[in-house]
């Protein structure tokens, strides 16, 4: 397979890059002055693309690479891949589900706890020497709080299971009601927000879920409510979130993703009731290796004419 051209769209993981280089003829997108230079020189050599949640395979890339057979994404989310165009051209698409579910669910709970118990602010309080001047203020408990989850898929279900361990009543919103669950279902996000204290975004990004957290939803959640986003930045209308936090219409937020990463609204940086993370939901050594192995396994399966491990298209 050493002669098969594979395009890596951006730096992702050292192990993945090393293994791609060993097993295939690797092209690194960032080694070229522009996309046009890459396409002009190697359009007929590239048969596979490895993308992620930042750079995938858009219509321009798909059209520019006529020999492309498969896109293997180093992510679960596929919003950076033109799936319609891939289907039209018979290009296979894979992702990395399941292997990152536990890490992302763990992080969601960590964000909830950090936001409610002001863990980051408490840490700064000790480091700054403020503790010597007096005790830290009281915070809010998590146990028993009602948790609403948008998207009860693999990750949403794992979050619900963890929250149950804190005696939290669970409710959810999904495209359809899930059979076999005892959680309360709400057909609209506004209804869900009106009936929970912590609202967690765990759904896929689609045109329908873009800005699913908007002014109406935030107002329904209320001034004591907390938004947790471990989905995609575009799930949240960021200007509306910022204004709600500034005006006290929302109690707090724990955010792992943002609309225009790595840029974060300036106003959020000074807020102690907001916890900000640099999109690290799956960011553990173990999980990133598992994700890389899944990408590699899908590529090898495709080029050996074997069934794909995690086919999407």
From Swiss-Prot:
Coiled-coil segments on the chain, per record: none
Catalytic activity of the protein: L-idonate + NADP(+) = 2-dehydro-L-idonate + NADPH + H(+); L-idonate + NAD(+) = 2-dehydro-L-idonate + NADH + H(+); (R)-glycerate + NADP(+) = 3-hydroxypyruvate + NADPH + H(+); glycolate + NADP(+) = glyoxylate + NADPH + H(+)
Active-site feature positions: 232, 261, 279
Activity sensitivity to pH: Optimum pH is 7.5.
SUPFAM superfamilies per UniProt: Formate/glycerate dehydrogenase catalytic domain-like (SSF52283), NAD(P)-binding Rossmann-fold domains (SSF51735)
Entry annotated with the keyword Transcription: no
Activity under varying temperature: Optimum temperature is 37 degrees Celsius.
Subunit structure comment from the entry: Forms homodimers.
UniProt function note: Involved in the biosynthesis of L-tartarate from L-ascorbate. Catalyzes the NAD(P)H-dependent reduction of 2-dehydro-L-idonate (2-keto-L-gulonate) to L-idonate. Can also reduce hydroxypyruvate to glycerate, glyoxylate to glycolate and pyruvate to D-lactate. Prefers NADPH to NADH as proton donor.
UniProt protein name: Glyoxylate/hydroxypyruvate/pyruvate reductase 2KGR
Highest classification ranks of the organism: Eukaryota, Viridiplantae, Streptophyta, Embryophyta, Tracheophyta
């Amino acid at each position: 397979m050493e002669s098969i051209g594979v395009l890596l769209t951006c730096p992702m993981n050292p192990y993945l890059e090393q293994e791609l280089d060993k097993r295939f003829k690797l092209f690194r997108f960032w080694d070229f002055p522009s996309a046009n230079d890459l396409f002009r020189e190697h359009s007929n050599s590239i048969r596979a693309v490895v993308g992620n949640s930042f750079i995938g395979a858009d219509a321009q890339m798909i059209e520019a690479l006529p020999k492309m057979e498969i896109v293997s994404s180093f992510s679960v989310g596929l919003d950076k891949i033109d799936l319609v165009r891939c289907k039209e051209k018979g290009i296979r698409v894979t992702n990395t589900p399941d292997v990152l579910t536990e890490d992302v669910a763990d992080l969601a709970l960590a964000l909830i706890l950090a936001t409610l118990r002001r863990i980051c602010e408490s840490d700064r309080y000790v480091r700054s020497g403020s503790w010597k001047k007096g005790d830290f203020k009281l915070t809010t408990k998590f146990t028993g709080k009602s948790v609403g989850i948008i998207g009860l898929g693999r990750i949403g279900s794992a979050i619900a299971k963890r929250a149950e361990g804190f005696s939290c009543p669970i409710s959810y919103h999904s495209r359809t009601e899930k059979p076999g669950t005892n959680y309360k279902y709400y057909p609209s996000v506004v209804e869900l927000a009106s009936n929970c204290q912590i609202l967690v975004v765990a759904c896929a990004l689609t045109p329908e879920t873009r800005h699913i957290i908007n002014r109406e939803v935030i107002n329904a959640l209320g001034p004591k409510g907390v938004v947790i986003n471990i989905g995609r930045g575009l799930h949240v209308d960021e200007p509306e979130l910022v204004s709600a936090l500034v005006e006290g219409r929302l109690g707090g937020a724990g955010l792992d993703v943002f609309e225009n990463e790595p840029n974060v609204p300036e106003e959020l940086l000074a807020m102690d009731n907001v916890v900000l993370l640099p999109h690290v939901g799956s960011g553990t050594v173990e999980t990133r290796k598992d994700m890389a192995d899944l990408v590699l396994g899908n590529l090898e399966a495709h080029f050996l004419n074997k069934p794909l491990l995690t086919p999407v298209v």
